[in-house]
UniProtKB/Swiss-Prot annotation:
GO terms for molecular function: acetate-CoA ligase activity; AMP binding; ATP binding; metal ion binding. It comes from Herminiimonas arsenicoxydans. This is Acetyl-coenzyme A synthetase. The modification N6-acetyllysine is found at K625. Its cofactor is Mg(2+). Mg(2+) binds at V550, V555. GO terms for biological process: acetyl-CoA biosynthetic process from acetate. The keyword Acetylation applies.
Length: 660
């Protein structure tokens, strides 16, 4: 791939407040550079020091990094520990037993608080219940549960006994669940009768039954069911058991099972691509270390913070920054069952006000949706709520366009909260490129600089470094402790996907394009490699065109894809959601012309969309991610044959198909 061209440079720079910087875990750029220099001088020693200081080991490690079978790297492999002990028991010994671990808000607004001592007891009972079903160290367990204290406890219980969990997002279909059960060779499924989202009871147990009825799931011995609503469900005798019955007679003590540092803590299947799902396999020690360090460095977590990451446990963000990271550092966190638009679009801000949230971490898609909602219904505008408890904001899941960044900064953060625009992936285990809120000057739309110990670069197809200002492939040149260890049952695919021979077989290929600012070296993610457009020989990232569209005052949200074009090779097709009612006919044509001219002015004529389609919304997963693969099919005017079970709003496809 030749370099990606970037036509617009963001010039705005924002510094964190002085008092924030003075009290930050990493205070000032000199402190950041000192950590980077330590990693450069003694890479293995840098990570070993951090692992010794942050993790509790039942058997200390003597080995640091093993690269003998690259790219199947190993860290601290002769050490042993238990992840659950590091998340729970440590707080019973350091004076935080009675500190609130989780503030759970149900869909209907009911609130439950649970301390570290109480959560420890619940996890131990759960773990003892799993052991009574002969679930042992190394067994795989599927978790298909809603956002809940019990969903988090299920993951921690697996970690406590050394079972490898694989959480499947509650929005996935029976077919998707079936594929994952078979690939993982799971012995049990942990689920709920229903999940409650946006005032609706959605079946989970019935979907599990449907998946198991498809056949081939011979490894499954038990289905454990958390009674969320008490609604009717079918029960298979001897296979199915209620969670409350499984745990009611169990002791609240369960000795944590020591596991090797490289023991698979979890498998998480990546969604969205065609073909067999990829089971991303993560280690225990290296993964947990990075979850802790990024909580401290990127979120600057303090003992009195109230932290809220809005992600579902079915996604990697809900693993690292809900189930593991916050608990390992002893944080008090919000866990929310519902959705941002129910009962109205002020729900998030009402919760920030009610719980005095100080750190808030959400996705750009949610931010853009809430911008549109606030303009449509001023009563839900964040200015109507007291958000003064906030001190730090975060963005995750996709690049945040500068205009959404600015709205977030002004309206949610009151121009006083740093924003950490975090770039990372399921495969990286945690943040890899992100501002440090006490050190890094912020630029809207840029994830800024790699974290200490992450050796990121922008290269061409042959792996050669590109100069700043030239876009190319984002890579990480050295193995880091939290990185993906394998694709479950598919090592060949692991090597081919992430460590291609073209790059030497040892360099991690992120699958994203990036460009570095000529002066600061800041990274901007230009989108997935397969989201790069080639217009008349010019390679352009979709993210830049989308940002230009969203910068227009009329536009709430935009997604851009390429479609074949006889003249230019590829042309730009934009799907746009306005802040007002969807236009039709001549009005739609007029607004489309205005937007094309706008993009030409913002970026250049080469970036003008040839086609613009207007919709009431964009096709999104239930976690809020835009399903661009479906937009590519719509742009080509082809019929959709892919699995759309994770699509939140299927009706939008027909609207966008006809909106030409």
């Amino acid at each position: 791939m030749s370099s990606i061209e970037s036509f617009k440079q963001e010039g705005r720079v924002f510094d964190s407040p002085v008092d924030f910087v003075n009290n930050a875990a990493i205070s000032g750029m000199e402190a950041y550079r000192a950590l980077c220099a330590e990693a450069a001088d003694d890479y293995e020693g840098f990570w070993a020091r951090l692992a010794q200081q942050n993790l509790h080991w039942t058997k200390p490690f003597t080995k640091k990094l093993d690269e003998s079978n690259a790219p199947f790297y190993k860290w601290f492999e002769d050490g042993e520990l238990n992840v659950s002990w590091n998340c729970l028991d440590r707080h019973l010994h350091n004076g935080n037993a009675d500190k609130v671990a989780i503030i759970f808000e149900a869909d209907d607004g009911n609130v439950t608080r649970i301390t570290y001592k109480e959560l420890h007891e619940r996890v131990c009972k759960f773990a003892n219940g799993l052991k009574s079903l002969s679930i042992n160290k190394g067994d795989r367990v599927i978790i298909y549960m809603p956002m809940s204290i019990d969903g988090i406890a299920a993951m921690q219980a697996c970690a406590r006994i050394g079972a490898t969990h694989s959480v499947v997002f509650g929005g996935f279909s029976a077919k998707s669940l079936h594929e994952r059960i078979i690939d993982a060779g799971a012995v049990a499924v942990l689920t709920a009768d229903y999940q409650v989202r946006g005032g609706k009871n959605l079946p989970l147990k019935a979907i599990v039954d449907e998946a198991l009825a498809m056949g081939g799931c011979d490894t499954i011995r038990n289905v454990v069911v958390y009674k969320r609503t008490g609604g009717a469900v079918d029960f298979v005798e001897r296979r199915d058991i209620w969670l409350h019955e499984l745990v009611e007679q169990r002791t609240s003590e369960c000795a944590p099972e020591p596991v090797g540092a490289e023991h698979p803590l979890f498998i998480l299947y990546t969604s969205g691509s065609t073909g067999k799902p990829k089971g991303v396999q993560h280690s225990s020690a290296g993964y947990l270390l990075w979850a802790m360090l990024t909580m401290k460095w990127v979120f600057d977590i303090k003992p009195n913070d109230v932290y809220w990451c809005t992600a579902d446990i079915g996604w990697v963000t809900g693993h690292t920054y809900v189930t593991y990271g916050p608990l390992a550092v002893g944080a008090t966190q919000i866990v929310f069952e519902g959705v941002p638009m129910y009962p109205n679009a002020g729900r998030f801000w009402e919760m920030v006000q009610k719980h005095k949230v100080s750190i808030f971490y959400t996705a750009p898609t949610a931010i853009r949706s809430l911008i549109k909602a606030a303009e449509a219904d001023p009563s839900t505008h964040p200015s109507k709520y007291d958000l003064s408890s906030l001190r730090l904001l975060g963005s995750v899941g996709e690049p945040i366009n500068p205009e959404a960044w600015m709205w977030y900064y002004k309206n949610i953060g009151g121009e006083r909260c740093p924003i950490v625009d975090t770039f990372w992936q399921t495969e990286t285990g945690g943040h890899v490129i992100s501002p440090l809120p006490g050190a890094t000057p912020m630029v809207p739309g840029s994830c800024t600089l790699p974290l200490p110990g992450i050796i990121a670069a922008v290269v061409d197809d042959g792996g050669h470094d590109l100069p700043n200002g030239k876009g190319g492939l984002l890579v990480i040149k050295r193995p880091w402790p939290a990185m993906i260890r394998n694709i479950w049952n598919d090592p060949e695919r692991f090597e081919k996907s992430y460590f291609p021979h073209e790059l030497g077989g040892r360099t991690y290929l992120a699958g994203d394009g990036a460009i570095r600012n000529e002066e600061t070296g800041y990274f901007t993610i230009t989108g997935r490699i397969d989201d790069v457009l080639n217009i008349s020989g010019h390679r352009m990232g979709t993210a830049e065109i989308e940002s230009a569209l969203v910068a227009n005052p009329m536009v709430a949200e935009a997604a851009v894809v390429g479609k074949p074009d006889e003249t230019t090779g590829e042309s730009i097709c934009a799907f746009v959601v306005l802040k007002r009612v969807r236009p039709e006919g001549d009005e739609a044509k007029q607004i489309a012309k205005e937007l094309r001219d706008w993009v030409a002015k913002e970026i250049g004529p080469i970036a003008k969309p040839k086609e613009i389609r207007f919709g009431d919304n964009l096709p999104k997963t239930r976690s809020g991610k835009i399903m661009r693969r479906l937009l590519r099919v719509l742009a080509k005017d082809e019929d959709i044959t892919q699995d759309i079970s994770t699509l939140e709003n299927p009706a939008i496809l027909e609207q966008l198909k006809q909106a030409q």
